[in-house]
């Protein structure tokens, strides 16, 4: 056993040393790239094409890591028998070795390195024209970004993969998997699974003469709504072009007038009704030591509500009750719905299949409540 442990230790040290050597060999000096083009100081939305239908921005990854790692629950989780057993098994050893190799390549602790690498933000985008995905990482330290590029390529070479590179307009594109390409553009790092999307982003980076997501009408309106909302503790902001997806026939079941599931109607009925008309949806993820909150918003008009308007209750009471604050709360849901009328008039809301299932449940519940009608007598008490 001791010999095996020593052997593994030697192998790990060898692996790290080899990784560092390969990283140093691969990484290009920062000044080997041409000077950044004029006016290159931009944001990700000014580089992405206008055909982007979904994007999410992580503005402060360093802050997220700090909040999670210093969370009051961390000590409790680490004291749990499951966690203690996992650590004793040696399973996290490879992860720890990888972190040490990453720190050695970056020349600083991993948290500090990730914070610096992403201090300009991370943007993930989906393109409508070809389904391509692009990830843009913006850093204030181009030298550290080049070190990271070298680290990724070194990992690929250690796995036995042959180095594959190609040049486009003076930038080197590296294959980091069978479908994923990586390009460093000065203080930007681009990852994409679609060559044409990558070329469009590089063209815009150099030329700045095409329509972009920043000029997309739906995105401009969504960005204004996000800017007007409370940005406190926001760690992720997102945009989804519902109209483009709806017109393209994507996820047709989501945009149907009626759904199969009553529980889904209770929780999402009003949202789904709105999705059939709204041009876009925005999302915000907020993180504090008290918890995680997801907020979704979309443009709305009163004439979109029929036939569901009645089932939300009286208009002057159209606000969901405040969530109950109880110790150790893991999940809570508050919704503003007239459950009794929803149940009684389910034919207006659910498909035939959903109504058949509801009829079976109604019979069973009426029997359980000694013959009292569940929709009228029981749910009516909640109105």
How does the language model describe each region?
Residues 188, 207-209, 220-222:
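Mixed-charge (acidic/basic) macromolecular-recognition segments
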Residues 14-28:
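Bacterial N-terminal signal peptides
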């Amino acid at each position: 056993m001791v010999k095996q442990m020593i052997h593994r230790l030697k192998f790990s040290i060898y692996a790290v040393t080899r990784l560092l050597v390969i990283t140093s060999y691969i990484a290009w000096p920062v000044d080997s790239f041409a000077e950044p083009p004029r006016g290159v100081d931009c944001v990700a939305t000014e580089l992405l094409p206008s055909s982007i239908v979904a994007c999410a921005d992580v503005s402060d990854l360093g802050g997220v890591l700090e909040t999670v790692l210093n969370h009051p629950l961390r000590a409790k989780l680490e004291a749990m028998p499951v966690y203690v057993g996992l650590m004793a098994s040696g399973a996290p050893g490879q992860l720890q070795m990888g972190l040490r190799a990453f720190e050695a390549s970056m020349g600083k602790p991993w948290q500090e390195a990730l914070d610096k690498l992403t201090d300009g933000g991370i943007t993930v985008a989906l393109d409508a024209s070809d389904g391509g995905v692009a990830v843009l990482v913006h850093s204030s330290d181009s030298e550290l970004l080049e070190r990271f590029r070298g680290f990724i390529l070194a990992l690929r070479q250690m796995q036995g993969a042959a180095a594959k590179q190609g040049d486009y307009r003076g930038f080197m594109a590296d294959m980091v998997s069978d479908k994923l390409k990586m390009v460093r553009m000065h203080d930007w790092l681009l990852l994409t699974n679609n060559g044409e999307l990558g070329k469009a982003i590089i063209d815009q980076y150099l030329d700045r003469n095409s329509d972009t997501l920043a000029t997309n009408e739906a995105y401009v309106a969504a960005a204004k709504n996000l800017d007007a909302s409370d940005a406190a503790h926001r760690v992720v902001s997102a945009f989804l072009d519902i109209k483009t997806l709806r017109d393209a026939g994507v996820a047709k079941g989501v945009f149907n007038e009626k759904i199969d599931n009553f529980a889904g109607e209770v929780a999402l009925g009003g949202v789904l009704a709105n999705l059939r008309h709204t041009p876009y949806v925005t999302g915000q993820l907020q993180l504090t030591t008290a918890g995680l909150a997801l907020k979704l918003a979309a443009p709305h008009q009163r004439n979109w509500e029929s036939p569901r308007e009645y089932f939300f209750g009286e208009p002057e009471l159209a606000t969901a009750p405040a969530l109950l604050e109880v110790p150790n709360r893991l999940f809570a849901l508050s919704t503003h719905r007239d459950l009794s009328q929803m149940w009684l008039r389910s034919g207006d809301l659910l498909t035939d299949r959903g109504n058949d299932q509801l009829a079976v449940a109604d019979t069973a519940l009426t029997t359980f409540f000694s013959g009292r009608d569940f929709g009228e007598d029981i749910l009516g008490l909640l109105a």
